[in-house]
Structures are given as structure tokens and as C-alpha cells.
């Protein structure tokens, strides 16, 4: 698997996980707040972990405390919530772009993770200024003298991998700033030597370094800076004495005062295997050298890509000379892909193509809006305007008015190889530099009402993500075709779908005589018949596509049949509860596609129409329209049945699954991309009935009328 998201989370090695499993099978631990032998042993393991952490950063317990946290964000919030700012004298009207002098200030770089930026709202009622600055404000300009002030410094950009000079730590401290280092990205591939650099606070997460365990981080606090943060509340395990009837309480020693509740002691014990893994790799310096080498090679590969007209395929968001020096650049490349005409491919489109090739990377702004704004030329006004147009963090809106709303990020770790770069290059060559085709011209949208299409095929999918054999006639319900997406396969309580489990395409399901569910393997060698009237066991609520739906379990016999058919263990077939108003449909009750549009794709890639229909998994297929004209419809009627168009259907790598083999073939999605060009790879329209009445049916041969009003 070409994995290029080590900045998101690096991967644990097989040996590391095997060692953890062996340790867990033999190690019995208990709550370290207790005093019996197992609890005492656990406490010793926790304290040994603190010492090992300090050793890793080349310091000792004489110089730093180790507060164990949940993650980097948790550590940063501990500092911000408890930092002893001075007296607040005035309100903050805006975020400053320069550092302010005086008392009680917060500063951070524009290139900061949202976990840093969000601290401004933690301290807003305590400080006199909040400043968001660039590195030059620290290294090249005079820093104003301050007291009782905190600067949260990014060690390495999680957006583009730029390493910020740790000289800033000393320069800020000389002027009275306490410095909290956000080291989350930096420590994943670089050594932080605390005998050379001495921030007041350092926050990081261990999964960034080891890949496993998750949910464990640390806040290192310089002992001569411990007086800068003061705990004013308490929780379980943090007090020496407390009285519930008065405000009296006395906190424990420094580290334990900030470690609220019971520590994740099993996770802490597993840190040992993470440190051993780093040593097996030759130490963090060897990892830095490996990842720097791979990152440089990836950069050179990306820069070499040209369209036939000579224009670059890749726009890179870093200065190339930084990649020559591992002290200035971490193992991250942020970029976007460009069209031959100079426009941009949306990063969602790129991500879908990567999924076909099995490449895993990150897209978006990576929780770093400041860097995103700088490198993509986005303004504060554009952010708010984009929000009004529906843009949200983590969604698929990747271009607005032709401008990218985010980028593509690749990043390397200790398990990375040249193969990862080769796979990315093959994907770019196949999908974005070769086989460029002109988008097909579409008919005048106003002509749609002059056509007289009819329904030619109908499909219902009783089991979500499983195939259908189709029928000529279906009864309608308030939630779509009767029995459509009424069943769902889960494995160890995880929902199976085609995107993650393409073997589901080897099954088909249909309702026979309205009273039996027939499940067959694709070759029809095995089948299972389930009476629809079967009394089922309540299985509780199930979260499907953001909806919580009450379900019932179809029993052990069905589960065992699915285990055999899918070569899995612990499969279960769930059915929507009888009184549920929802089924397992993702977006809309019906998906309608145009047979002529299917035919155009069929001719283009030499794939049979029937196979394309199978891959597109529509409910309704109409005949008698020019290709792609259905995009212009707002409403339609199928004889006396009225429907409204909800949205276009944006396609993903699911249509690339070969129903005969379960393997992924990118040709169909590539053809769709070329035909649609800048239409977001949509195909088909989602529709919803607006005049439903009990007893209605939809059948093949019915006439269809479209409206663009």
C-alpha cells in the first residue's frame, strides 16, 4: 500500500505490533492510584516511561517535568489554561500582525495548527493582545520586551514541512516571552535536543513518532519555568487533600497535579516498544536522513511533470532550495495539480484517482488555515464568502471560482520507500498528464423539454452495497422503492461497503414474490433464501451515513452463510426496524441515469453498457435523451408521479470495481473525468418523490417528462 500520510500519522511496523501483542498477552497492570502489588508495578512502569521520554530528548529529570497527556492539543491547552498572565487592562478588538510589548500577551505564527490558533479563545479574557506573525517578525525585527506573556511556536509546518528556526526560542525568551513549542510534526522525523534548545514547554503526541499507541502525548515543562503555570482546579488523582464542604484542597506534586483522572497506563507501557522500534531503524537521525532523501526525490519527480504543451502539471507550495537542507525542510510536499490550460484540478478529483491506485495521502488545508491562505492566495474575506457558499472543513468543495480551497499533501516516514513515489508518479502520468481529452459538448439546456424519454430499467438494492438483478415493476414507499437498502452487512460491528470491501460486488440480492429475500453469489453457485416475515432480534441503533437507524439482526444462519460467501468471520445481516422512517440510503431515495450518457462512456472505453449500468448502481434508467442533458433538470414526472431533483451524483472509486472479479479498474472513472472535465465527475441525478401516496408503483415503459424551471 503506497502510504503517503505520515504527517497525519506514521505507521507502526509489523515487528512493533507483534511485540506489543506479546507484551499485552503477558502484562497485567492496574490503576496506579491503588497500592497493591500490581498497582505499584504499574506506577513504576509509568515513572520509567517518563525517564525514557526525557532520555529520548537528551535531557533529564533535573531539567524537565513530564506531564503525560492525551495528545498535543491536550498539552497545549494545559499551558494556555493555566499560564499566569498578568493583569488584563483592555479588551482585544482584533488579531495583531505584529508582536506587542507590555504585559499579558499571546503570540503565534500564521503557520500554526488550529490547535494552536484555538488557544486564543482560551486566553482571550486574560490577555491584552493576541498576535499572529510571520517568522521574520522574530528573526529579523526587534522583539518588544514583555512580561507574563506566552508565544506558541510551530517547530515544523504540518502544511508544507517548513522547519522554523529554533533560534527563535532564545530570541523570544531574551525579551521575556515564555515559549511553548508545538513539536507534533517536528518530532515525527527529527531529533529535538533539549540540551541545546530549551523551550519552556514542549507538546507532542507519540503516534506521530511511533504510529502506535494512539491517545498518548506529553507536555515537557522546564523545571525553572514550572512557576509560570498554576493549576487552580483539581480532579481525581491530583490532590493530596480536599474537603467537599469547603473550598480547601492541596494539589499533588507538579506532574500528577496536571494528570487528571486515571492515566492510560496500558498505552504508556506500550511506549517502550515504540522507542525500541526507533532504535531498530538506527535512531531518529537515520529516519531523518531516509525521509529527507525520499522527500527530495518526490519533489524532483513532481517538478519534472509537464503537459504536452510544456506547462507544468504541479504547483508546489515550498521553496525548492529548502529541500536541500534537512534542518530547514521536513519530509512533506504540499502541491496542487494543474490542467493544460493553467487551471486547477480539484484535490477531491485527485484523491479519488489516488484511491483507485491504492495511494493514501491527505487533501484540504490540514487544520492549518494560515499556511493555506499564504500559499493558495486566499484572503480572510474569501474564507467567509466561501463559507456562505457552503464550504466546510473536510468537505469535497475543492475549487471555488477556479481557486483551490486546499492542497494535496504527501509525507514520508520510517516505513516509506521509493515504491511510494513510483506509485504516485504512475497515477499522475495515467490520470493527469496522459489521455487528456476535450469535454463533450452538451445540448442547449432549454431543449430538454422537447424530448420524450421513457423508463427502460429499474433496480432496487435490498442489501446496501450488494448487487441487484432488477425488475420491471416496484412498489413505492415514502422512503423509495419498497425494500430498497433495507438490509446491511456488518463485520465485527463495522459496516461493509463497496469502497472498502469490493468483494461485496460478488453478491446479488432480490426480493422474490414480495415475501422472500434471495441472496446469491455472482456465479449463482450458492444462494440463501430469507423469509421477509421472519421474526428478528432487536439489534439496537446503527450509525449509517451520519444517520442513526434502529436495526434488527437476521440471525446466525445468515451470518454463517455470509462468512462463507465473503471469506470472513463474524458477519451479520441487519435489517431496518419495522417502525423506522429511514433506510440505509446515503443521499436520496432514487438515483436516475440516462442510457445515452452510459452509451457514450461505453463507446469511449469499449466497455459494455450492461457492465457500466451495474457499476453505476442506479434505481431508474431512462431512454430517449441526448447524453448528459439530464444535468439541467430541476423537476420531472414519471406519468402521474412527481419528483424533484435533489442534486447531481458525484462519483468515486466505487464505480471502478469490476463486478466479476472485485478488482479495481480506473478506466471508467478516468473516462468520466475526461467527459465531465470540470463537472466534478458527476453522473446521474438524485431525485425525491413529492406526491407520494400509498399503493403507487413505478414500472418500465412509463413516460418521463423533465422540466428545467
From Swiss-Prot:
Gene3D superfamilies assigned to the protein according to its UniProt record, in alphabetical order: Aspartate Aminotransferase, domain 1, Type I PLP-dependent aspartate aminotransferase-like (Major domain)
Catalytic machinery residues: 367
PROSITE patterns: MOSC
Pathway this chain belongs to: Cofactor biosynthesis; molybdopterin biosynthesis
Catalytic activity: Mo-molybdopterin + L-cysteine + AH2 = thio-Mo-molybdopterin + L-alanine + A + H2O
Domain (MOSC) ranges: 563-707
An example molecular function term from Gene Ontology annotations: pyridoxal phosphate binding
Protein keywords: Molybdenum cofactor biosynthesis, Pyridoxal phosphate, Transferase
Membership in a protein family: Belongs to the class-V pyridoxal-phosphate-dependent aminotransferase family. MOCOS subfamily.
Identification of the protein by name: Molybdenum cofactor sulfurase
The organism of origin for this protein: Caenorhabditis elegans
Source organism phylogeny: Eukaryota, Metazoa, Ecdysozoa, Nematoda, Chromadorea
Gene behind this protein: mocs-1
Amino acid at each position: 500500500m503506497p502510504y503517503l500520510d505520515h504527517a497525519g500519522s506514521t505507521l507502526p511496523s509489523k515487528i512493533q505490533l507483534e511485540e506489543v501483542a506479546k507484551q499485552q498477552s503477558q502484562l497485567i497492570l492496574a490503576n496506579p492510584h491503588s497500592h497493591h502489588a500490581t498497582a505499584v508495578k504499574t506506577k513504576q512502569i509509568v515513572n520509567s516511561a517518563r525517564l525514557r521520554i526525557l532520555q529520548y530528548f537528551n535531557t533529564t529529570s533535573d531539567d524537565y517535568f513530564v506531564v503525560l497527556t492525551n495528545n498535543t492539543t491536550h498539552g497545549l491547552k494545559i499551558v494556555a489554561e493555566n499560564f499566569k498572565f498578568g493583569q488584563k487592562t483592555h479588551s482585544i478588538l482584533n488579531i495583531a500582525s505584529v508582536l506587542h510589548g507590555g504585559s499579558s500577551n499571546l503570540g503565534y505564527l500564521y503557520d500554526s495548527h488550529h490547535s494552536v490558533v484555538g488557544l486564543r479563545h482560551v486566553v482571550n479574557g486574560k490577555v491584552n493582545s493576541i498576535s499572529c506573525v510571520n517568522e521574520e517578525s522574530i528573526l529579523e525585527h526587534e522583539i518588544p520586551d514583555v512580561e507574563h506573556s506566552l508565544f506558541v511556536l510551530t517547530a515544523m509546518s504540518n502544511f508544507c514541512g517548513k522547519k522554523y528556526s529554533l533560534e527563535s526560542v532564545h530570541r523570544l525568551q531574551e525579551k521575556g516571552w515564555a515559549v511553548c513549542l508545538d513539536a507534533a510534526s517536528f518530532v515525527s522525523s527529527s531529533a529535538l535536543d533539549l540540551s541545546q534548545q530549551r523551550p519552556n514547554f514542549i507538546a507532542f503526541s507519540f503516534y506521530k513518532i511511533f504510529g502506535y499507541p494512539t491517545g498518548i502525548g506529553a507536555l515537557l515543562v522546564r523545571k525553572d519555568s514550572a512557576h509560570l503555570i498554576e493549576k487552580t482546579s483539581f480532579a481525581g488523582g491530583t490532590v493530596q487533600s480536599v474537603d467537599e464542604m469547603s473550598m480547601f484542597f492541596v494539589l499533588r506534586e507538579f506532574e500528577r497535579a496536571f494528570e487528571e483522572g486515571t492515566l492510560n497506563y496500558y498505552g504508556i507501557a506500550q511506549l517502550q516498544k515504540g522507542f525500541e522500534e526507533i532504535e531498530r531503524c538506527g535512531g531518529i537521525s537515520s529516519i531523518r536522513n531516509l525521509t529527507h532523501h525520499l522527500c527530495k526525490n518526490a519533489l524532483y519527480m513532481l517538478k519534472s511533470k509537464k503537459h504536452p504543451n510544456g506547462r507544468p502539471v504541479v504547483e508546489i507550495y515550498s521553496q525548492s532550495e529548502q529541500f536541500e537542507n534537512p534542518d530547514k525542510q521536513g519530509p512533506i510536499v504540499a502541491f496542487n495539480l494543474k490542467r493544460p490550460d493553467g487551471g486547477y484540478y480539484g484535490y477531491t478529483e485527485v484523491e479519488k484517482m489516488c484511491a483507485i491506485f491504492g495511494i493514501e495521502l491527505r487533501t484540504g488545508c490540514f487544520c492549518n488555515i494560515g499556511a493555506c491562505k499564504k500559499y493558495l492566495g486566499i484572503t480572510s474575506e474569501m474564507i467567509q464568502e466561501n463559507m456562505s457558499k457552503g464550504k466546510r472543513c473536510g468537505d469535497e468543495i475543492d475549487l471555488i471560482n477556479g481557486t483551490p480551497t486546499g492542497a494535496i499533501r504527501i509525507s514520508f516516514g520510517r516505513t516509506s520507500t521509493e515504491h511510494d513515489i513510483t506509485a504516485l508518479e504512475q497515477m499522475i502520468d495515467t490520470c493527469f498528464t496522459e489521455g487528456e481529452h476535450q469535454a463533450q459538448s452538451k445540448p442547449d439546456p432549454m431543449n430538454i423539454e422537447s424530448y420524450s424519454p421513457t423508463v427502460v430499467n429499474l433496480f432496487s438494492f435490498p442489501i446496501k452495497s450488494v448487487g441487484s438483478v432488477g425488475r420491471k415493476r416496484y412498489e413505492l414507499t415514502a422512503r423509495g422503492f419498497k425494500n430498497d437498502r433495507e438490509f446491511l452487512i456488518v463485520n465485527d460491528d463495522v459496516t461493509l461497503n463497496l469502497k472498502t470491501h469490493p468483494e461485496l460486488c460478488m453478491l446479488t440480492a432480490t426480493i422474490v414474490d414480495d415475501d422472500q429475500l434471495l441472496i446469491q453469489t455472482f456465479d449463482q453457485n450458492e444462494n440463501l433464501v430469507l423469509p421477509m416475515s421472519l421474526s428478528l432480534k432487536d439489534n439496537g441503533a446503527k450509525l449509517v451515513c451520519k444517520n442513526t437507524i434502529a436495526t434488527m439482526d437476521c440471525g446466525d444462519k445468515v451470518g454463517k452463510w455470509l462468512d462463507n460467501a465473503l471469506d470472513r468471520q463474524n458477519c451479520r445481516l441487519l435489517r431496518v426496524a419495522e417502525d423506522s422512517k429511514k433506510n440505509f440510503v446515503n443521499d436520496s431515495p432514487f438515483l436516475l441515469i440516462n442510457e445515452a450518457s452510459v452509451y457514450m462512456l461505453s463507446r469511449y472505453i469499449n466497455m459494455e453498457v450492461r457492465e457500466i449500468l451495474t457499476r453505476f448502481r442506479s434505481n431508474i434508467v431512462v431512454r430517449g435523451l441526448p447524453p448528459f442533458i439530464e444535468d439541467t433538470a430541476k423537476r420531472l414526472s414519471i406519468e402521474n408521479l412527481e419528483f424533484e431533483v435533489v442534486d447531481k451524483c458525484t462519483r468515486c472509486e466505487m464505480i471502478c470495481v469490476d463486478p466479476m472479479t472485485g478488482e479495481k479498474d480506473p478506466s471508467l472513472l478516468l473516462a468520466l473525468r475526461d467527459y465531465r472535465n470540470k463537472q466534478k465527475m458527476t453522473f446521474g441525478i438524485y431525485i425525491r418523490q413529492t406526491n407520494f401516496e400509498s399503493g403507487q408503483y413505478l414500472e418500465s415503459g412509463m413516460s418521463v417528462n423533465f422540466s428545467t424551471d
